[in-house]
Regions:
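Positively charged, small/polar-rich N-terminal and surface patches that mediate targeting and assembly
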Residues: 18-20, 24-34, 38-40, 67, ...
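Generic preference for well-ordered secondary structure
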Residues: 6, 17, 25, 66-69, ...
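Short amphipathic alpha-helices in soluble, non-transmembrane regions
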Residues: 23-29, 85-93
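Short, well-ordered beta-strand segments in beta-rich or mixed alpha/beta enzyme
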Residues: 7-14, 52-89
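Long, hydrophobic N-terminal alpha-helical segment
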Residues: 2-28
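A broad, low-specificity signal for short, low-complexity segments enriched in glycine/proline
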Residues: 1-4, 30-38, 72-76
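Glycine-rich beta-strand-turn "strand-cap" elements at beta-sheet edges
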Residues: 2, 34, 40-65, 94-128
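Residue-level signal for secondary-structure boundary sites
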Residues: 20, 80-82, 121
Length: 128
């Protein structure tokens, strides 16, 4: 099965004392993204961020000791679908309302972000 998806990937710091509020925000935001064309929306919290000889995600976003590092991606069936979804999400009034009211500590200026086309996709038969 060759499914060459397109993804938006991102890494960002969130204050640890606001993780619950951020999680609630992301649950709502994920549904909006899927409503506008995303196939999947995933975010993970950093648990093991150091490997000798490499630059850590925490360094990448200048995370402090009081911040958790989140890594996520949004999956689309194509770049075209992603571009349309980005436009729709940017114009969806629910997004600004959610972020403004969430008290989640989200700061887009500290987020590292980019769009990526598929290079290799190797999955186990039973993989999620």
């Amino acid at each position: 099965m060759d499914m060459a998806h397109y993804i938006d990937g991102f890494v960002l710091p969130i204050p640890r004392d606001r993780l619950s509020a951020y999680e609630n925000l992301v649950k709502a935001v994920a549904e909006i993204w899927k409503e506008h064309g995303a196939l999947d929306y995933l975010e993970y919290i950093g648990d093991d961020l150091t490997l000798e000889g490499t630059r850590s995600f925490a360094d990448l976003v200048d995370a402090t000791e009081d911040e958790a590092v989140l890594f996520g991606w949004v999956v689309f069936d194509s770049r075209e679908t992603r571009d349309l979804a980005n436009e729709k999400v940017a114009n969806d009034p629910r997004m600004a309302e959610l972020v403004a009211s969430s008290n989640s500590g989200f700061n887009a200026k500290r987020m590292v972000y980019g769009g990526f086309r598929s290079l290799v996709q190797s999955r186990s038969t039973g993989a999620v």
